[in-house]
A protein has these predicted regions:
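Secreted/luminal cysteine- and crosslink-motif detector
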Residues: 6, 117-119, 139
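Short, solvent-exposed cationic patches
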Residues: 133-147
Length: 147
């Protein structure tokens, strides 16, 4: 249940090329984040925690889309490989909390040029939820805009 009146911003997509010609992905490593939230109900304190590793979320979504994740860059498939970079790119106050914005880039392993990128924000019960939602919205926006 959300008491926020302001909607999340729609994902922003930049497309300089098509990712359909690529078969492999190499995802830059990211660190796990663990966050928690708590509340008092009827005089009792309840808490929950959530953990997320952004590269695992990205990998799961892209693998489901048919990409093959490589554990390292391989020279013999350079022309078919995208390097995937992730970063947190902002925060915005929204209602009683804030959103976390993420940006994901898809770089050609062969030319080191930006093929496409997406930026989206998420807001959940914890920062881990925010990040997971932002990544999902970002990639959903990218794949729903495929030509």
């Amino acid at each position: 249940l959300s008491s926020n009146c302001t909607p999340l911003k729609p994902p922003a997509i930049i497309k300089n090329g098509t990712i359909e010609k690529y078969k492999y992905i190499f995802i830059s490593p990211t660190s796990s984040l663990t966050s928690s939230s708590g509340a008092i109900y009827g005089g009792q304190y309840y808490s929950s925690s959530a953990s997320v590793n952004p590269s695992d979320v990205i990998s799961g979504i892209l693998t489901k889309k048919g990409f093959i994740r490589l554990p390292e860059l391989r020279r013999h498939v350079t022309g078919e490989t995208l390097i995937v970079n992730y970063g947190e790119s902002g925060r915005r106050n929204r209602g009683l909390g804030y959103t976390i914005e993420v940006t994901i880039q898809f770089i050609s392993s062969e030319s080191n040029s930006l093929i496409c990128s997406c930026t989206a924000e998420g807001q959940g019960s914890t920062e881990a939820d925010d990040i997971r939602q932002a990544i999902t919205r970002c990639l959903s926006g990218l794949f729903s805009n495929r030509n």
